[in-house]
Amino acid sequence: MFYNLNGGSELKRAAVFFANGFEEVEALTVVDYLRRADIHVDMISTIDNKICRGAHGIDVAMDKLIDEISDDYDAYIFPGGSDNAASMRQNKKLLDKIKKVFNEDKLICAICASPTVLYEAGILAGKKITSYPGVFKNIEGGFDYLEEKVVVDGNLITSRGPALTVYFALEIIQALEGEEKRQQIENQILLAMM
């Protein structure tokens, strides 16, 4: 169990999933901002290696392998990167986990190409989503595609790409910790200056 040393209450927990080819900005900005918001974040490798290489050649050490985790996270987060998403779409263990935790009303978040992973897991039917432009061009999946920065539909948060990662992370913070914590992080990162 993880406790917030600043307030004593139990910390929310988030798992961010990686494979080789992950989009560094989308992955590490989310990890950074959630940790600033006192959310416990584990970086999870979906490959058989605790080092994952980003789309732009940055190697990042993971906290755990997918086989080492349980289903007790409050949020499950999937950064983009076309190779990252392609690898995750082929990972049956991951797809089964996504379906299970989604049906338990856990928060599921994907940005850029990774909403296609959620599609492959079979959880997008009837949902409002967004993604990087064009990744769903040959897919008719029964979801409502919106060209917005971030789309929230129940326990599902999706976003479009690297420049919008700030807003994606803030929506996750708001969903887990509320509007006040989101405002605190917005002030800390000088969002009003953008």
Q: What positions do the PLM features span?
A:
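Mobile, glycine-enriched helix-loop/loop "lid" segments at the mouths of ligand-binding/catalytic clefts
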Residues: 50-52
